[in-house]
Amino acid sequence: MFGTATSANATRVLLLGSGELGKEVAIECQRLGLEVIACDRYADAPAMQVAHRSYVLDMLDGKALEEIINKEQPAYVVPEIEAIATDKLVDLEEKGLNVVPTAKATKLTMNREGIRRLAAEELDLSTSPYRFADNYDDFKAAVEHVGIPCVVKPVMSSSGKGQSVIKTEDDIEKAWDYAQEGGRTGAGRVIVEGFIDFDYEITLLTVRAVDGVHFCAPIGHRQEDGDYRESWQPQAMSENAIKAAEYTAEKVVNALSGYGIFGVELFVKGDKVIFNEVSPRPHDTGMVTMISQEMSEFALHVRAFTGMPINKIVQYGPSASAVILGQGTSTDIRFDNLAKALAQPQTQVRLFGKPEIDGRRRLGVVLTRRKTIEESVQDAVENAKKVKIVY
């Protein structure tokens, strides 16, 4: 049963993280008359612009987080980012707080170590070879064990921050320094991953709901500098590869438990899949579902965590997303040439409303639906380039 937003009987949703993904979750909550409270470390974040009210805080501060939760008494706490005081959420969940999908899932996936150990050591899923390191000497030993080339990532980071590839021994020290600069909570533990041979990588959006586990069509994507640039759906896969991907994803989400959508990242080689990572929330590559599906990943997430059935996920056909990427320094961001970007049918633009930029930042996305994946991706990329960012 839902109450009415802003009334005494309101059903409240507290968003922890208010970026572009949180913004779409907030909009889907609004469609159901839920009262949305958005939190982030900076003011005027995208989800705050469509929420009933908002708070600015360091979400790694457990005391500050608990104060807001006690004040707002939310029916659902919905994390959108990794950098949250997860130990506090675990404590509060034991006292009755409803964390989406669960506080355990949020804590385990907060860093790459928890989820990698779950997948490889508890669930016995295929992963790349890996080692963890806390200091430079252990890091060098980890690189030697895994072998060159290898990938280095902070155990806690997002959007490719702190991630690099070691191709020669000359890269080792630089990779360590870069990882120490890029972690969400500052310097610390890293994962060294061995290179694996794969044909392509996918995100398998997997919904755990009251009526079972459901799968979206696989999403292919292209990464650059550790961050996605384009995604498309459906990614062509063999029947055996799809079965293997769904088996792996279902095993992971059932181990994490709770209701909601999970972005399961997999490498695919022929009919074989290798587990990479999972996010217990909507995934950035899944923004393509805003044009490719009857229910976007955000609508599916809200429907699932509020205890409603999913029934059937309908996919409309070849679709793509391409990032509108800004680079500069400004608190006065404007966009021009939108009419040119929208000149073709079945094309949409989403501008995130980020209030500032300092360096490189994802500011929007172009969505397309065409007769083929190739056309969809090409048109999405070309139309994204037409959007002129004025700083």
UniProtKB/Swiss-Prot annotation:
SUPFAM superfamilies: Glutathione synthetase ATP-binding domain-like, PreATP-grasp domain, Rudiment single hybrid motif. GO terms for molecular function: ATP binding; magnesium ion binding; phosphoribosylglycinamide formyltransferase 2 activity; phosphoribosylglycinamide formyltransferase activity. Mg(2+) binds at E265, E277. It catalyses: N(1)-(5-phospho-beta-D-ribosyl)glycinamide + formate + ATP = N(2)-formyl-N(1)-(5-phospho-beta-D-ribosyl)glycinamide + ADP + phosphate + H(+). Residues 117-306 form the ATP-grasp domain. N(1)-(5-phospho-beta-D-ribosyl)glycinamide binds at E20, L21, E80, D284, K354, R361, R362. PROSITE patterns: ATP_GRASP. One of its GO terms (cellular component) is cytosol. Pathway: Purine metabolism; IMP biosynthesis via de novo pathway; N(2)-formyl-N(1)-(5-phospho-D-ribosyl)glycinamide from N(1)-(5-phospho-D-ribosyl)glycinamide (formate route): step 1/1. Its EC number is 6.3.1.21. Involved in the de novo purine biosynthesis. Catalyzes the transfer of formate to 5-phospho-ribosyl-glycinamide (GAR), producing 5-phospho-ribosyl-N-formylglycinamide (FGAR). Formate is provided by PurU via hydrolysis of 10-formyl-tetrahydrofolate. Homodimer. Belongs to the PurK/PurT family. This is Formate-dependent phosphoribosylglycinamide formyltransferase. It comes from Vibrio parahaemolyticus serotype O3:K6 (strain RIMD 2210633).
